Amino acid sequence: MFYIKTKKKFKNNALEIKDIVKKLKQLNYVEDELTEKVEQNIDFAKRHLVDTIYKQAILEGVATTFADTESIIEGGKVNNMTSEDVLKIINLKHAWEFILNKNVILSDTNFALLCEINKIVEQGFYYTAGKIRNVPVTIGGTTWKPDFPIESKIKEELEEILKRNLDDVDTAIELLLYTMKKQIFIDGNKRTSVIYSNHYLISRGKGIIVIPAELTDEFKDLLILYYEGRDEKEIKRFIKEKCYMSI
C-alpha cells in the first residue's frame, strides 16, 4: 500500500509555482484580465481534471484506474501502484494547476513555458527536468530517431507555427505534434506536449485536447506514422475529431 502525503512531500510546490510565475512575468507577462470565455474554459478544464489526468496517465503507460487517479489527486491512498506511477500522476496534477493559474494563462505559449511545464512533469525523476536533452533517445515501435534539439531552432519553429494562418484548434494540434516529435526533453515529452498545447487552447477559450484512454493504441500507431513522415494528415484529423473537446 502506498500512502499519498502530498501536503508533506510536496509542501513547497505552491512556492515553486509562485517562483515560476514570477519568472514568466519577467519574460512576457502583461497585466490583464481574463475574458469571460477564458474563465469558462478554465472552469471547464478543472471540472474535467481527474478524467484528463487519468487519460494522460494511460497514454504514458501508468498502471492506474480512474478511481485510483481520483484518489491520488485528492490526496488519498491507493493499492498496488508503484511510487513512480503515483508521482507521475501528482506531477500531472501540479502541471495542470500551474497552467490554469491566471498569471500563467495570460502568458505566451512559448519555449520558456514549455520548459517550465516539463520541469514540473518530471519533478523527482530527472535533475535535468525542464532542460533540453543532450543525449540521444530512441522511440519504441520505430527505428526513427529524433535529431538533437537546438534551442534557437525550436524557438524559431514554435514562432513559425504560431504565425501560420490557422484556427486556434489547428494551431494547438500543430504545437502538440511538433513538440512530441522533437523529443526536446529527456523524458515526459508527451505529457508536456499535451499540457503545453492545452495552455494555448485554454488561453483562447477554445476547449481542451486529451487522448481518450480507449483510443491510446490507435493514437500511438498514428504517432509512429507521423514521426516517420509517412502520414501527417490522419493523426491531425484523429486529434480534431476524437480528442478535442469544445466548451
For the regions a language model picked out, list residue spans one by one:
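FIC/Doc superfamily catalytic core
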Residues: M1-I247
